[in-house]
Amino acid sequence: MKWDSVYHNQLEILREALSKLHRPHVTALIDKILSTQGSLFFVGVGKNGHVAAKAASTFSSLNIKSFYLDPVEALHGALSVVTDDDLVIGVSKSGNTSELYAVFAALREKSSNISIVLVHSNDTISNRCEAISDFSLFVKISHECDMFNIVPIASVAAFTVLFQSLAIHLAHHRGLSLDTFLENHPGGHIGTLRKQ
């Protein structure tokens, strides 16, 4: 497989994923985030753990209080940081990841008031995490882009683009100013822009 064909294939899958998104569910997720009084916690396992961490980083950089919740740490004491005012967003291709399910189940046992949302690409009915979520957002991924159709390439790209798009939408909706954005970024090239 040539790299440019893989690149092109990912773009096609992203277009398909966008066209198949159930807009009312996207709106529901946006509304859920906007109505959250506490923090957002993104959680995922494996490659989707990196997706979750990137989402939390982007949201927080746009002045939306967000954190990455490591699933192993969560099951060994870190659940203490999640309160009834928070929203937990899980990322899983299958919706059946055992570690993510364990986190969701532990959160449910801790409090029925904690909001849990699952973002996944499993269109079958065997989705354990979805069963204990408040609601879920299905992201259509027709196939991965590798020779085995198993390496999480297209799914990671689709989840990442979705979260980046939501972050910008929400920051704009909340009226994030350039001054506030720059205040939160005193370092690097962005930090130099504030001094100009």
Regions found by a protein language model. Give the residues of each.
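Catalytic cores of large soluble enzymes that bind and process phosphate-bearing ligands
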Residues: K2, V6, L21, K47, ...
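Glycine-rich phosphate-binding loops that contact phosphosugars or nucleotide phosphates
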Residues: L34, G38-R174
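Internal, active-site/partner-interface "lid" segment
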Residues: C145-D146, A171-Q196
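An N-terminal, well-structured beta->alpha segment
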Residues: M1-S35
